[in-house]
């Protein structure tokens, strides 16, 4: 049985709750001692993992809609992507304000150079910013065929974000490996589009180098 438009609306409500409740829990944990011995790192990892979860959920929607024959599921993809961007922004903000501090934000540029995993993270965030800004139907009409080309960069984020996570942890644990494995699986399900994106990037790099 296919989902109805009303059921998809209720599903969106549930997804909004899924995006909001972790934030409410985080606020509670900060104020009631629910974090570990290094609360700053806990906040950074929690916000980053939540962003990654929404990224993976966003990538899951298209193959799930196809294989389950639920075309209306596509309507939830933008919502999931926006929650991914929101949590990625919280992740970046927590690093800038809690790790560096308000008085040391000028060091962010130096940090990006000396810590390559931060470079991957900021590249991912910039891509997500562009995707969030152009996610409306009005922008889709304005960009035309270029809209899909731009939004295919989500597959690049799906590679960079897990690497950023793996690189940032001092001790390799199963959790970042699981996220990386899920990202690889979802990219495999979208093999044609991800291959098209990387072939185009390779050609652009080759053309610039040959100039």
UniProtKB/Swiss-Prot annotation:
The keyword Coiled coil does not apply. One of its GO terms (cellular component) is plasma membrane. GO terms for biological process: protein repair. It is a multi-pass membrane protein. Its cofactor is FMN; heme b. GO terms for molecular function: electron transfer activity; FMN binding; heme binding; metal ion binding; oxidoreductase activity, acting on diphenols and related substances as donors. The chain crosses the membrane at residues 10-30, 82-102, 116-136, 153-173. Its main location: membrane. Pfam families: Ferric_reduct (PF01794). Part of the MsrPQ system that repairs oxidized periplasmic proteins containing methionine sulfoxide residues (Met-O), using respiratory chain electrons. Thus protects these proteins from oxidative-stress damage caused by reactive species of oxygen and chlorine generated by the host defense mechanisms. MsrPQ is essential for the maintenance of envelope integrity under bleach stress, rescuing a wide series of structurally unrelated periplasmic proteins from methionine oxidation, including the primary periplasmic chaperone SurA and the lipoprotein Pal. NCBIfam families: PRK05419.1-1 (NF003830), PRK05419.1-2 (NF003831), PRK05419.1-4 (NF003832). Belongs to the MsrQ family. Heterodimer of a catalytic subunit (MsrP) and a heme-binding subunit (MsrQ). This is Protein-methionine-sulfoxide reductase heme-binding subunit MsrQ. It comes from Escherichia coli O157:H7. The lineage of its organism: Bacteria, Pseudomonadati, Pseudomonadota, Gammaproteobacteria, Enterobacterales.
